Amino acid sequence: GASGLIAFPRV
């Protein structure tokens, strides 16, 4: 989760 950016899954 990066500030609610879908481009960033919880990796």
Swiss-Prot record:
Per the record, GO CC terms? extracellular region
Recorded coiled-coil stretches: none
Provide this UniProt record's keywords sorted from A to Z. Answer: Amidation, Neuropeptide, Secreted
Source superkingdom? Eukaryota
An example of a Gene Ontology BP annotation on this entry? Answer: neuropeptide signaling pathway
Reported function: Mediates visceral muscle contractile activity (myotropic activity).
Q: Where is this protein localized, as stated in its record?
A: Secreted
State the InterPro entries in the record: Periviscerokinin
Give the protein's recorded name.
Periviscerokinin-2
Q: Which positions does the record annotate as the modified residue Valine amide?
A: 11
Name the source organism.
Chroicoptera sp. (strain Windhoek) (Praying mantis)
Which Pfam families does the record match to this protein? Answer: Periviscerokin
The UniProt similarity line reads: Belongs to the periviscerokinin family.
